């Protein structure tokens, strides 16, 4: 019985894999991204907890609301991670981020289960990044960004992201509990890898700005 309960609770516990992602994003001064990851963590964990045994007391929101925002938060996390990788200056950065916030909300309201829920934001972000980087390569007449970015960030990050999506859409029928839990872990790892080492647009260099957990929680609530 204990093993069964632990198995049912595993998707909830595995969603805590986003917690290190929140911490790392904040330390790298990606404060907006950290808040999005925390938002995702909250709704994904609560959604799975409400589906678990003996935890219905935690369900202070309707199931369809939890389901919607867990999917929305995940898709939005993908979008802001890729926009952070693109490294746009203002006002382009905030414009593209808000474009994703609005269009993803409408897309998921229309259909939250299709492949397009995640492939749409990812595909659009990749096209935007490719257009910017190709222009930079043309101006620089060389590779942009540095080779290390491709080998240490983009390659591993996209591999973990692809693994997460394959687990989510093609392998959950094998064993939902374990596969979905690995999906959470792979997705969190993808976000960490795709985020640049430091947010160059966060202000003057020096000691990174502090953002404690209470600020993040208040912003999400």
Curated annotation (Swiss-Prot):
GO terms for biological process: muscle organ development; myoblast fusion; myoblast fusion involved in skeletal muscle regeneration; plasma membrane fusion; positive regulation of skeletal muscle hypertrophy. It is a multi-pass membrane protein. The keyword Iron-sulfur does not apply. The chain crosses the membrane at residues 4-24, 35-55, 65-85, 93-110, 114-134, 154-174, 176-196. Residues 25-34, 86-92, 135-153, 197-221 are cytoplasmic. A lipid is attached at residues 217-218 (S-palmitoyl cysteine). Residues 1-3, 56-64, 111-113, 175 are extracellular. Keywords: Cell membrane, Disease variant, Golgi apparatus, Lipoprotein, Membrane, Myogenesis, Palmitate, Transmembrane, Transmembrane helix. PANTHER family: FIVE-SPAN TRANSMEMBRANE PROTEIN M83, POST-GPI ATTACHMENT TO PROTEINS FACTOR 6. It is linked to Carey-Fineman-Ziter syndrome 1: An autosomal recessive multisystem disorder characterized by hypotonia, bilateral congenital facial palsy with impairment of ocular abduction (Moebius sequence), micrognathia, glossoptosis and high-arched or cleft palate (Pierre Robin complex), delayed motor milestones, and failure to thrive. Interacts with MYMX. This is Protein myomaker. The gene is MYMK.
